[in-house]
Amino acid sequence: QQLRKFAVAKAGSEDVILFADSDMLFVRPFDLTSLSDDGAIRLYRKPDAITAEMARHIPWCTHASTLLGLDAPAFPSPDYINNLVSWRRDHVLALLDHVESVSGRDWVSAIARERQFSEYMIYGYFVERVLGLEAAGHWPDARELCKVYWFSEDAAGMDRLASFEEVL
C-alpha cells in the first residue's frame, strides 16, 4: 500500500491526492476546500514530534534522508504521518524522478530496498528539505483532522467512555 501511494500519481491526473487510511471513518461532513489556502495545499506537519528516543521512527527518517540524498536527519524531526494526508501530484512525480536520479535505480527498487519506510516521511522530507514548503505550494498544519489511537497514551481513559460519541 505504501508504494501504491506513489504510483497513484503516475496513473492519475488530479492535481491533489488525498489519502485517508482504511481504518478511519468520517462521522461528520468534511469540506475538502479546508485543505487549500490560496492555491497552497495543506501538509500535515507536526514540528519536533519525532525524537531520538522513538526507535520505530528513526529508520523511517534515516531512509527518507538517504533516499533523497540529504544529510542525516536532525532530531527532533517534524512528523508527516497521519490518517488524512494531502499531497501535490506534481511533487510526487518530481520526488520519484529525484529518487531515480539520486539512486541510479527505478523508484520502486530504490524505495523498497529498505523494508521499513514511511511514504509520508519521504514525501514530507522531499517537499520541505528538497523543495522548501513555500516553494512547493504547501502550508504546514499540525492539527490532526481525525482522532488517532495508535499509541497507548492516545487511548488513555477510553476504558471509562460510556459511548462511541464521547470519543469524538
Give the residues covered by each predicted segment.
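Short, solvent-exposed loop/turn segments at secondary-structure junctions
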Residues: D23-V27, D31-T33, D48-I50, E128-V130, ...
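A glycosyltransferase accessory/donor-loop signature
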Residues: D97-L168
